[in-house]
Amino acid sequence: GKLDPLIGRETELERTMQVLCRRRKNNPVFVGDPGVGKTAMAEGLAQKIQKKDVPDLLKDIQIFSLDLGGLLAGTKFRGDFEQRLKGVIAELQKRPKAILFIDEIHTIVGAGATSSGSMDASNILKPVLASGEIRCIGSSTFEEFKNHFEKDRALSRRFEKIEIMEPPVSETIQILKGLRSRYEEHHGYVYTDSALKAAAELSVKYPITALAATTPAMTAASSNPPVKSDTPAAIPNRATG
């Protein structure tokens, strides 16, 4: 209900499921430019699991998202963060059908560490990832992956990199059509095929940019009072507003 459907990305999703079914190095990390749909991949996988449209090894799996900011919040003393994260890991170890999703996974490198020698999040996760006790899905941009995540060799070699590239215009149009009904219901207006096609072609690369191109028009239309036939409509412009 709350998650938008994943349209396309069948090759990347199939690759993700193959990695998760391994005995070792069974942790995929989605790497791509901002806006290509890395988080949507994890949401799409969750929906496939819910529909049981996955291999037997992944049936009844539960995906948990790690709120790293919440774990760090209010940690005044050395060891507070370590204790919280170890508590999360211990709880996940009790659930053999659990997968941990960490958005912006490069942020765990150095998270919680202090000059006094306390361990950061990545060092706490490494042992359980190496043993296969916990499976993890991460996401990061190309720049952050290269500059931060990949430099921690002991951590990055536990993961299988899956590149999420920008979709072609034809696939972006299909993505927009798949999400059209939800945006129409929200705004109370109709998106025409030509409007979606124009948004995809003008945004060129990213579905999120195409959505951003169509949303302001709908928002403006739905927030203004309806124009009656006997009332002249004011047309705003850049010069006068």
Tell me what each language-model feature is.
Residues D4-T16:
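N-terminal pre-P-loop "Q-motif" helix
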Residues N27-V29, D53-G70, R158-K161:
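Conserved catalytic segments around the Walker B and adjacent sensor/switch elements
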Residues S65-L92:
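Short glycine-rich substrate-engagement loop in P-loop NTPases that contacts/grips substrate
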Residues P55-D56, K146-R157, K161-A213:
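Conserved C-terminal "switch" segment of AAA+ ATPases
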Residues M17-L58:
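Walker A/P-loop
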Residues L20, K86-A90, E104-R135, T141-A154:
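Conserved catalytic/switch belt of AAA+ P-loop NTPases
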Residues N26, Q62, Q93-L100, S131-I137, ...:
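Loop/turn-to-beta-strand initiation segments
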